[in-house]
Regions:
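Surface-exposed molecular-recognition determinants
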Residues: 1-370
Length: 370
């Protein structure tokens, strides 16, 4: 209540008077699910939508990360902790279903043995199995499954060997994060281009390296186009992003206000670490140091249901979940570092975050602290 009559055309300063968010419930487009393995065919039906990209990791066992998507097909697996190319595993993700997915009997996703049977899957909604995209200069067919409203697309293509070829991403805005993996032929790393990496530099999802300058081996070029990304520099190296005749998949993300955020912060080596504003209560936070070596670290609000969020998995290793590494408070409007890990004094870190709930807005209940 006001002591005096407020001037016309003004509202009180509160979350209810923020504009209505385009995405009122983050779980409509991104959701985390947990389960206990059964060693038998296992339908997971709690995602809330039919996922187009599912990333699975065993929590209490040292198994490879399993990444599958609707464009390549459910049984086609790649691993974030490895440079191996795509392989078929009919007993991992068997199908994408109306409200989730069905698992087979692979121990990587569905072991029933006590002490090795806890799993997590992170799920994103794109645009189904995809369609042909002709926005770029690549001469071969490009397939894109895009959800511009949620800032996410899956892109597959066969390389044509042309240096600096461009490939359509279907987002309609400049991406903030692009992650690329070779699917066929010889092994090759996961190239990552984040909007806060220096110009001409990439980082690797399956390694601990600092950001690295692009070489004749290629990579992903700077992010500056609302229609395409660039396969930079190389055409012949087995590890690049456009070697002739080899298949590739690329996951592209753009910022959506109140739903996704991509940025950077500087560490202070304190349990009273930096606060990072996102504009929402995060469901999922991924962090990586860029000025020196260091593992990727991933926390979410499902595995850590209260603060601090310290149930950590590492995309670049097959190791099990750790509770003695990174510690992060997931707040109503962002996150705060609560340990020296991912928070070295003066060090630079990039992050990606997806929302559990927007901070507030017209017709939306305000996000609360955990």
């Amino acid at each position: 209540d006001f002591e005096y009559t407020q001037p016309s055309g003004y509202n009180s300063w509160c979350t209810a008077n923020l504009p209505a968010p385009d995405i009122a419930d983050g779980s409509d487009y991104f959701n985390t699910v947990l389960w206990t393995g059964t060693s038998a065919e296992n339908p997971i039906s709690t995602v809330g939508f039919q996922p187009d990209f599912t990333w699975i990791k065993g929590r209490d066992n040292s198994t490879n990360h399993v990444l599958a998507d609707a464009v390549r097909g459910a049984t086609k697996v790649i691993e974030s902790d490895s440079d191996v190319v795509e392989y078929t595993d009919a007993q991992s993700v068997k199908s994408f279903d109306t409200n989730g997915f069905t698992l087979g009997t692979s121990n990587d996703v569905n072991n029933s043995t006590a002490g090795y049977n806890q799993y997590v899957a992170w799920n994103w909604l794109a645009g189904g199995s995809g369609s042909t995209n002709t926005d770029g200069t690549l001469s071969n067919t490009v397939t894109v499954s895009a959800n511009p409203s949620a800032g996410f697309s899956i892109v597959t293509y066969t390389g044509d060997g042309v240096s600096n070829a461009t490939v359509g991403h279907g987002l309609g805005v400049v991406p903030a994060l692009v992650i690329s993996k070779v699917l066929s032929g010889s092994t090759g790393p996961w190239y990552v281009k984040h909007k806060n990496l220096a110009s001409g530099k990439n980082i690797y999802l399956n390694w601990t390296d600092a950001e690295t300058s692009l070489t004749s081996g290629g990579g992903i070029g700077d992010l500056n186009s609302s229609t395409t990304f660039t396969c930079a520099n190389g055409s012949s190296n087995n590890g690049n992003t456009n070697s002739s005749g080899r298949g590739y998949v690329t996951y592209c993300f753009a910022e959506v206000e109140n739903y996704s955020k991509f940025g950077s912060y500087t560490g202070n080596d304190s349990s009273n670490g930096p606060f990072v504003y996102c504009g929402f209560r995060p469901a999922w936070v991924l962090v990586k140091r860029t000025d020196s070596t260091g593992s990727w670290a991933l926390v979410d609000s499902s595995r850590s249901s209260y603060n601090v969020a310290d149930d950590v998995l590492f995309p670049n290793t097959s190791g099990s979940e750790s509770t003695s590494d990174t510690a992060i408070d997931l707040l109503s409007n962002g996150f705060k570092l609560r340990s020296a890990q991912r928070n070295f004094s003066g060090a630079t870190y990039i992050f990606a975050a997806f929302a559990e709930h927007p901070l507030g807005g017209d017709g939306v209940s305000p996000a609360t602290a955990r």
